[in-house]
Regions:
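Catalytic Walker B motif of ABC-type/P-loop ATPase nucleotide-binding domains
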Residues: 126-129
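A short, proline-enriched helix->beta-strand linker immediately N-terminal to the Walker B motif
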Residues: 120-124
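Short coil-to-helix segment of the ABC ATPase nucleotide-binding domain corresponding to the Q-loop/switch region
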Residues: 66-73
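Conserved ABC ATPase signature
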Residues: 101-111
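Conserved ABC ATPase "signature" region
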Residues: 35-36, 73, 81-97
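Conserved ABC transporter NBD signature motif
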Residues: 28-36
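Helix-to-loop junction immediately C-terminal to a conserved catalytic motif
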Residues: 20
Length: 199
């Protein structure tokens, strides 16, 4: 788990979009899992995004007319090697809501559906933009615990973009961004579980 920190406008979301193959580079290169994604052609980038990357954005982008289960299945239906639906719903504790619609869920529950949708396709990389930005402290801890569980249970590398310094405590590595540049990249020697964070 990596936490990418920086003030608003520092380039965190741009970095996330470049890692996910959504934005292109002006200079330099990006290598993910031995693959230089900054040199991939459009079709290869689409394949990379579909197979290797899961996205969880600030706005969950759930489809309002689909149930929780259907929102997740939309992604699993196009995935090459999706994880079992029941296993993913259990991992993020949303199985009991599977027949509900997004407007019947709390913000934290919607966030868990978004996480489930991102991980069902079994991505190598899970990119989370301001994962807890609109959530209260208790819900934030629960969502971060689910991300830890996803990392441990499925072996997914996770990058969380945030301006909240406290989240860095749960990370294996912390990257700091300022004015579009990486100003620090450190291993976290004192990693603590998400439920012990003081948010």
């Amino acid at each position: 788990i990596y936490v990418i920190l920086g003030p608003s406008g520092s380039g965190k979301s741009t970095m996330l979009n470049m890692l996910g193959g959504l934005d292109s580079l002006d200079s330099g290169s990006i290598t993910v899992d031995g693959k230089e994604i900054s040199k991939l052609k459009s079709g290869e980038l689409t394949k990379y995004r579909r197979s290797d990357v899961g996205f969880v954005f600030q706005f969950y982008n759930l489809i309002p007319d689909l149930t929780v289960k259907e929102n997740i299945q939309v992604v699993s239906d196009i995935a090459k090697e999706p994880l079992p639906l029941d296993e993913v719903m259990q991992a993020v504790d949303i199985g009991k809501y599977k027949d509900r619609f997004p407007n019947e869920l709390s913000g934290g529950q919607q966030q868990r559906v978004a996480i489930a949708r991102a991980i069902i396709k079994n991505p190598k990389l899970l990119l989370c933009d301001e994962l807890t930005g609109a959530l209260d402290s208790k819900t934030s801890k629960n969502v971060l615990k689910f991300v830890e569980k996803v990392n441990a249970q499925f072996g997914t590398t996770v990058a969380i973009i945030t301006h909240n310094e406290m989240i860095a405590g749960m990370a294996d590595g912390v990257i700091r961004i300022k004015d579009g540049k990486v100003v620090a990249n450190k291993v976290n020697e004192t990693k603590i579980p998400a439920d012990k964070l003081e948010l």
